[in-house]
Amino acid sequence: FGLFSIDFASKKVKFFTFFGRAAGETKFSAKKKVTAKNIRNVASNGVIATAVFATLFITGGMIINQAWYYCFFCIGQLPALYLLFVNTFNSDRLYDCAIASEQNNFADVLAETLNLQREINDGKIPEESELIMRDNQPIALYFHYLFTLIKGEKDTALKIFDNVKIKDLTDEEYDLIFPEIVYSACVRGDGDKINTLKTAAENFFSLSPENIGALRAHYAFRKFCGDEKWSEILRSSYTKALESRPPFIRLAEENLTK
């Protein structure tokens, strides 16, 4: 839930997002090198803040006698305890406790991808690290996919997401990877997969996602479905949008669509 969403990378603000996929979301690009320790520290602070939040509501409900204030603190106790529980005792890689743990390498992968994104946005064409090359987490696979395209290995790249479970993707991962799965199915002529993904694809494209992969996947999807006119309009939008992308992205896209 959120009244607006902010994307610092593109300098865009979307108001009245409410319950949309990007509701209350804030996106930004790192301006300097990020380390796994930085990310684990932020996650640890999140656990501490959640614990403090829960303690305040529980303590307030115990010591305050005035009716209105008492109701306020009592109402807040349940969500406070819920947040404390899911944020502290959840083993999912995306929750603060799991990210803060050194047994989980998600912080390492996240730091690496943030640094790669910073270099890409600065107009550089970075080298693929060993971590990105061997890790099988979705966001690492996405960057491995881009690096594989940079090398000109299109056929190999199109198979990278074959074993990804769409239901396990986060919203951000879904926005990046789902259109690539659709595009791969279209160019490989996999009608069975397109039929399986068709409803989800229609819903996804109806939200007008702005990333370049989604534009490319959308025109390929419309062409596969036989709507040549719509496909050409979308392809024109894709070509125009590609002009403003960093060299790394342009090279990957050129190798994918040639």
Regions found by a protein language model. Give the residues of each.
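Generic helix N-cap/helix-start motif at coil->alpha-helix transitions
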Residues: N104-V109, D135-F143, T170-P179, S208-R216, ...
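Alpha-helical segment of the N-proximal tetratricopeptide repeat
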Residues: N105-I160
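Alpha-helical repeat scaffolds
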Residues: K124-R134, K154-D168, D190-F205, D227-A241
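Charge-dense, extended regions
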Residues: E232, S236, S244-K258
